[in-house]
UniProtKB/Swiss-Prot annotation:
This is Serine-aspartate repeat-containing protein C. Keywords: Calcium, Cell wall, Peptidoglycan-anchor, Repeat, Secreted, Signal. It comes from Staphylococcus aureus (strain MRSA252). A motif (LPXTG sorting signal) lies at residues 869-873. Residues 51-127, 669-881 are annotated as: Disordered. The modification Pentaglycyl murein peptidoglycan amidated threonine is found at residue 872. Residues 676-686, 703-845 have a biased composition (Acidic residues). Residues 51-486 are annotated as: Ligand binding A region. Cell surface-associated calcium-binding protein which plays an important role in adhesion and pathogenesis. Mediates interactions with components of the extracellular matrix such as host NRXN1 to promote bacterial adhesion. It is found in: Secreted, Cell wall.
Amino acid sequence: MNNKKTATNRKGMIPNRLNKFSIRKYSVGTASILVGTTLIFGLSGHEAKAAEHTNGELNQSKNEATAPSENKTTEKVDSRQQNNVEQSTTSNQPKVNESDNTSVKETTEEPQNTTSTQPTKKNNDATANKDNLAAQNISTQANDVSATPKTTTIKPRTLNRMAVNTVAAPQQGTNVNDKVHFSNIDIAIDKGHVNSTTGKTEFWATSSDVLKLKANYTIDDSVKEGDTFTFKYGQYFRPGSVRLPSQTQNLYNAQGNIIAKGIYDSTTNTTTYTFTNYVDQYTNVSGSFEQVAFAKRENATTDKTAYKMEVTLGNDAYSEEIIVDYGNKKAQPLISSTNYINNEDLSRNMTVYVNQPKNTYTKETFVSTLTGYKFNPDAKNFKIYEVTDQNQFVDSFTPDTSKLIDVTDKFKITYSNDNKTATVDLMNGQTNSNKQYIIQQVAYPDNTSTDNGKIDYTLDTDKTKYSWSNSYSSVNGSSTANGDQKKYNLGDYVWEDTNKDGKQDANEKGIKGVYVILKDSNGKELDRTTTDENGKYQFTGLGNGTYSVEFSTLAGYTPTTVNAGTDDAVDSDGLTTTGVIKDADNMTLDSGFYKTPKYSLGDYVWYDSNKDGKQDSTEKGIKGVKVTLQNEKGEVIGTTETDENGKYRFDNLDSGKYKVIFEKPAGLKQTGTNTTEDDKDADGGEVDVTITDHDDFTLDNGYFEEETSDSDSDSDSDSDSDSDSDSDSDSDSESDSDSDSDSDSDSDSDSDSDSDSDSDSESDSDSDSDSDSDSDSDSDSDSDSDSDSDSDSDSDSDSDSDSDSDSDSDSDSDSDSDSDSDSDSDSDSDSDSDSDSDSDSDSDSDAGKHTPVKPMSATKDHHNKAKALPETGSENNGSNNATLFGGLFAALGSLLLFGRRKKQNK
């Protein structure tokens, strides 16, 4: 910069010359505003092998017959996951006692009936809960479930209550059969019995066999809480075992969390599942499941027959032919089977076939003896039907009673032993009879018994006393409740504690959408729900016991103070609390939250013109500076730009650690940091900050313009050269003689003009450097040469005149201009070098000759030569005089010669 000023001052502004200027442009980089949140999804693997919890009893009878073949309509999966299932056994032991008056000895058949059950996680003492003996739950547990937890809180929808009712408003979900995808579907016989004749595996319904429905599944991420999908079972296939399927059928993951709650409709043989808030908390949900199933006895009625077992899971259909055998022995005068176990009260619904062979008896007394069970005479469910068609003894022990004759009122049923024994005289006054009967009765669990329970039948005839026994073993892990036990409710309220005092005030309102999970004393999940629009939740149908309730924390809320005050009904019990039910509802389990305060940070980016690192009142903000905010993990959670006043800010921040990053504008340098009070200094390009329950508007940064260097070099060189040469020559001659006149004029004009201009400019700098070098070189050379030569000759004689004129003009003009400019600094360098060199050379040469001749006599020879010479400014008088005298002598000689010729002529 200084060099340029010096050159300009020396030469000034030269007209008609190139004058250059360097203009530096200041710019500030800009960036677009980007404020957003990244959702980070973590990975969570849920793997375990678990099947549907089934607490079942299957009647087992030893049937000697062979089995038909098994045909499948679709290919079976080769590898099957099977869970170990504990068995409960029903032992049917017909005891044939030989009468005193007969020599015929009948053999005793002892078919062993075994039920297979899937234990749940809850272990109930078999002696304390007799109702556990026969139940087989249908709550399906998924195997190898995997899901990715969602890190963002999604506001849940209120769920339809299934197993447990709550006060939450029911959610009308959408059927998403097309979004739940099933594969590797299979219906397998668990255990099974191989027919020794055919080699085929058969399903023996009364001998410990069950069917297992298996499949893998995936759930689309678009599925939400409240959405539904269905399992549709075919004509010969249903969920459950000998125990009827529960109306409630839940789908669990491997950890026991409920993914979906199912409601079974026996009328349509369909289970409708409703997704819980689990699908709102996790993505990429997939897994597999096993579900205990059974032949639908009222339709699949005949032994050794293959029935097509069909199921449609979502939109995926599957079918397989299964050979069914119930073990009915048509030659046996007394045989019984557990038709089904009621899922609600666990009562045994028994069917007894009497006198299938149609024997004739004179004595026929039927006695039922219960152990662990009792009859309820008031229920009037002890029925006696007379058989009119042998085909009414269906193998499945599920006769169509509408086609039978109800003759119960014709017989006297005598109850004894505290309603644990019932006796009927089937002769009813007749002397003999071959009538056939189907007897149905219901046995209710007796909680006072410590025995696992059994039901014994005897038919005392005049020929033989026949016996048949149905026994049941307990199933460990069954969570089946006592059918006679009273049910209670548990729950209450989740509210917003606006004043943060931990107490429910009248003006404070409930919070909708909080997830609530109910667990038993062993930590097993029993149910889950979501608070309704009033913050209410409730679990119903619970027995006496200890439960735990877990509350989720909605995004933007913080749990309030726990157990404030002395009134448990209006305080907050925290995120996890324990509730005890003892012969009454417990509606005191509440949880309070207050909105988590949000904070802001930011402030100012300014131009520190005096470079002192302090914000002065005269210094202004810089617009368009990009500012990035990171959380403690280094994740970008927001970006912005300073406004026209240099201000910026980030809002809605939780207490925590953050980092603010300023992006340096182009062409500016960071000013000094931490030079004064925190709200007036510069904090640097990256600033760590911790917010603890307050805003922070002290995060500033300053910049100043980078230093620049200008170097200008001007060089002007002017060279003027003028050379003039004039030459005049006049010659007059009069003569009568011959005259020769030679005039030579030489004019040489040489003009050399050299102009050299060198301009070097070197500059190193981190700032901006402008170097202008102008060099003007003007060289003018004028060379004029004039030569005039006049020669007049009058003579009668001969005259020779020679005139030589030489004029030389040399002009040399050299102009050298060297300009060196060196500038070293931390700057950028721009160097412009202009060199102008003008060289003008004018050479004029004029030669003039004037020779007027006036002959006085004949001229023999006349030569006139003239050569223009440059005008030199001098006269050649000697040459003129010589010419004059030469002319005189020539004229005199001519006269003398002329006189002699005249004399001779005379």
